[in-house]
UniProtKB/Swiss-Prot annotation:
Organism name: Marinobacter nauticus (strain ATCC 700491 / DSM 11845 / VT8) (Marinobacter aquaeolei)
Domain TRUD positions: 174-304
Active site feature: 96
Catalysed reaction equations from the record: uridine(13) in tRNA = pseudouridine(13) in tRNA
Family: Belongs to the pseudouridine synthase TruD family.
GO molecular function annotations of the record: RNA binding; tRNA pseudouridine(13) synthase activity
Leader sequence residues: none
EC number: 5.4.99.27
Role of this protein: Responsible for synthesis of pseudouridine from uracil-13 in transfer RNAs.
Example of a GO cellular component annotation carried by this entry: cytosol
Top-level taxonomy: Bacteria, Pseudomonadati, Pseudomonadota, Gammaproteobacteria, Pseudomonadales
Record-given protein name: tRNA pseudouridine synthase D
Length: 351
């Protein structure tokens, strides 16, 4: 917790303490993200020559590689190039600006198949087009299967044996699945705004106030995420974050879960419900937001399991880490369980 913020924004780590420090995002090339939506088509496109459009449907989906541009900026530019509304451009998730990212965008272009190659050539002057697919519907958040990461950490400090042990632990056990601090705004500013919301304004059926309503949803989401992190922190502290406890809803193979608070609170029961409500009741300013909303309570896995986890020391202080995460999980959260990370992109201007 910073001196200027009332909000805890750094939560307990699985090993009790971090093993060292590291610099993150020294350059965009040190943080590579590859979105996987249609693996077979992505592999076929990578192995072939010029990009051809496959499939049928009203939406042209383009797999683009971008550096130094955030997702929403690219979506707006694509709408202008394609001559469609911004609303008609879809994507599966927001990707960092300060990175090299490969992700899919969908453009609503019914009956314009003959012009696809011309548009792709124009788009390709801005961002390399890696694959193209015609599809029956717009891409939406969370449609993708996974995100692959290749991250280079520089100026790594800490005892090598402790760092190696921590890497082994991440590979075998995973990391606490905290929401990343970017969701909460600078020094928790989104949470400060959340406690000032009139909960009735979050009811979508009572009218929409444009940008103001959109901001309220952002702040509401920040509150929900912070309460989840608080419950997860309690589970990490008592070393039960990898266990399914009595009173948790049926996990359906998801392992232990925590609450995404909603109308009625939590889906847990018994002792687990008592634990979760106790944590949330300690934050009455946020808890009241959920008393008059129609958001259903949900669950989120407590553990982020990085798949295909591997690492390589490029020199004595430079570490390359590669892994795959499910949608909604954060690479910086996984690495932050082991390292105190200094994000050098924060010192650069945002678009």
């Amino acid at each position: 917790m910073s001196e200027d913020s009332q909000w805890l924004l750094d939560w307990p780590v699985s090993g009790g303490a971090r093993a060292g420090r590291a610099e993150l995002k020294t350059s965009p090339e040190d943080f590579r993200v590859t979105e996987s939506l249609w693996p077979t088509r992505e592999d076929d496109a990578a192995a072939s020559g010029p990009v051809e459009v496959s499939g049928d449907g009203e939406h042209l989906c383009l797999r683009l590689e971008k550096t130094g541009d955030n997702t929403e900026y690219v979506a707006r530019e694509l709408a202008a190039l394609a001559g469609c509304r911004s609303f008609d451009v879809g994507f599966c998730g927001l990707k960092d600006r300060h990175a090299v990212t490969v992700q899919w965008f969908s453009l609503y272009r019914p009956g314009q198949e003959a012009d696809d190659q011309a548009l792709m050539a124009e788009v390709g002057q801005r961002w390399p087009v890696r694959a193209a697919v015609r599809h029956s519907r717009k891409l939406r958040r969370g449609d993708h299967q996974a995100n692959g990461f290749e991250i280079v950490l520089r100026n790594v400090t800490g005892q090598r044996e402790l760092v190696e042990a921590g890497l082994e632990r991440l590979a075998s056990q995973g990391a606490p699945n905290y929401f990343g601090p970017q969701r909460f705004g600078f020094q928790g500013g989104n949470l400060d705004r959340a406690v000032q919301i009139d909960p009735s304004r979050l009811n979508r059926k009572r009218g929409r106030a444009g940008r103001s309503a959109s901001k309220n949803v952002l702040y509401f989401s920040a509150a929900r995420s912070w309460l989840f992190n608080q419950v997860l922190a309690e589970r990490v502290s008592n070393r039960t974050w990898t266990e399914v406890l009595p009173g948790e809803p049926e996990p359906s193979g998801a392992g232990p879960t925590g609450p995404l608070w909603g109308d009625g609170g939590t889906l847990a029961s018994g002792e687990q419900e008592t634990l979760e409500r106790g944590v949330v009741d300690a934050c009455p300013g946020l808890a009241r937001l959920f008393q008059s909303t129609r958001m259903k309570p949900e669950r989120r896995p407590l553990v982020a399991h990085p798949g295909e986890f591997k690492w390589q020391w490029l020199d004595t202080t430079t570490l390359r880490v590669q892994f795959v995460l499910s949608p909604g999980q954060y690479a910086t959260t996984v690495l932050g369980d082991l390292f105190e990370l200094e994000d050098l992109s924060l010192s650069r201007d945002n678009k």
